[in-house]
Amino acid sequence: DASWSRGLGDVYKRQVCLLLLSLLISIYIALDRVREDKIISIVLSIALFGILLREIDIEDFNVPMWVVAIGSGDGRTLLLSIMLAPVLLFMIVKYQKYYDLVKKYFLSQVGLSLVLSFCLLLIGSMFEHEYLLSRTLIEESFELIAYGLLFRAVFIMSQSEIKV
């Protein structure tokens, strides 16, 4: 059915818009030199970038093959690992400083939104491989709500800093 397929396209567009907006806000927060909690925004920016790359089919764009190679599949995983590894290593080295910050974040509204978003993404992924008539719509709906929660978390972060 063309209308169902078109409706699903609208869901994809909304997902990408929410992810892109969330990514831009989290990058903006990460670039704020005076915030003590910017490390959380850096990790969140990398995660949002990875989710955004997963949501868009980079192969469908008129980009060089090397961009497709690093923006999808194993290349994407390697790229994100290379981006995330130094940040996590830095956090491990500065464990005392960041342990309390991470704990406070997960006990805040931001953390609640991130945990709920993760849970909804897991639930949505369960429908990805099920053979239901509207399984894709169910999966994408869960993802859209999850991305809305990610946006909520980033928006809350942009409004106030959590200090240790």
Model-derived segments and spans:
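Membrane-interface helix-boundary motifs at transmembrane edges
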Residues: Y28-I40, K97-S108
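Terminal transmembrane helical module of multi-pass membrane proteins
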Residues: D100-K103, L120-S160
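Membrane-helix boundary/juxtamembrane motif in polytopic membrane proteins
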Residues: Y95-F118, I138
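Membrane-interface interhelical loops and short amphipathic "cap" helices
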Residues: R6, D60-G71, Y131-E139
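C-terminal ends of transmembrane alpha-helices
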Residues: I51-P64, F118-L133
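Membrane-proximal helix-loop-helix units in multi-pass membrane proteins
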Residues: S45, I51-K104
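Single conserved hydrophobic/aromatic residue that forms the stacking wall/gate
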Residues: D1-Y12
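Hydrophobic cores of alpha-helical transmembrane segments in multi-pass inner/ER membrane proteins
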Residues: Q15-Y28, L79-K94, E143-S160
